[in-house]
């Protein structure tokens, strides 16, 4: 599953 990224709280 995609992990949360530090970009606008989106996912990788």
Curated annotation (Swiss-Prot):
Gene Ontology CC: extracellular region
Keyword field contains Disulfide bond: yes
GO biological process terms held by the UniProt record: defense response
Tissue specificity note: Expressed by the skin glands.
Disulfide bonds: 5-12
Alphabetic keyword roster: Amphibian defense peptide, Disulfide bond, Secreted
Compartment(s) of residence: Secreted
Keyword match Disulfide bond: yes
Primary location recorded for the protein, binned into one broad class: secreted
Superkingdom of this protein's organism: Eukaryota
Protein's UniProt name: Riparin-1.3
Organism of derivation: Crinia riparia
């Amino acid at each position: 599953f995609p992990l949360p990224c530090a970009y606008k709280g989106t996912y990788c």
